[in-house]
Amino acid sequence: MEFQDVVRRRRMVRDYAARPVPEEVRERIIANALRAPSAGHSQGWAFLVIEDGADRERFWAAVTTPGEESPWSAGLRRAPLIVVALSHKQAYLDRYAEPDKGVTDRRESFWPVPYWDVDTGFAALLMLLTAVDAGLAACFVGIRPERTADFRAAFGVPDAYRPVGFLTIGYGAPDVPSPSLGRGRRTAEEVVHRARW
């Protein structure tokens, strides 16, 4: 698929067919995430891949409030592949303490924004685009802060890794487009400023 077609087709899909993601496609999705840019080539990310039915149930039990059901979550739960993208701040602080960077005190205030989260988001976007390129559907969703401890406990995730979000991936089923799409995309005239605000 041409890159512009991938970009145009990319949307958040919230319902999936009961069909597994082929292993070679899954591995390509992960491999492309590893190609994401990262400050200082820190690569401060990790990815938790969840495919087994029992593991997926454990995931949903950990990240949702008991008894919480909604039309969108029912469709997401059918995704045969879940990839949690986690950022690792310490990898950046350590990398930038090295001689070629020179931030030896590892101060977080050096960073104008948390690039460990930004770069993990880049990796997640590459996974979304790779899924579309392979003819799959995907959705990026966050884990609510009050559910993070349960998620960590369920999967043994170390405290040094923060879940930036997770992707549900699979073959899309007919789903109801989000009402938010009615807002339309903002135009370049609204958001692009050339040489001055």
Per-segment meaning from a language model:
Residues 3-13, 164-197:
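C-terminal helix-cap and adjacent tail motif
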Residues 32-34, 83, 103-153:
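Small-aliphatic-rich amphipathic alpha-helix that forms the alpha element of a beta-alpha
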Residues 33, 39-42:
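N-terminal structural module
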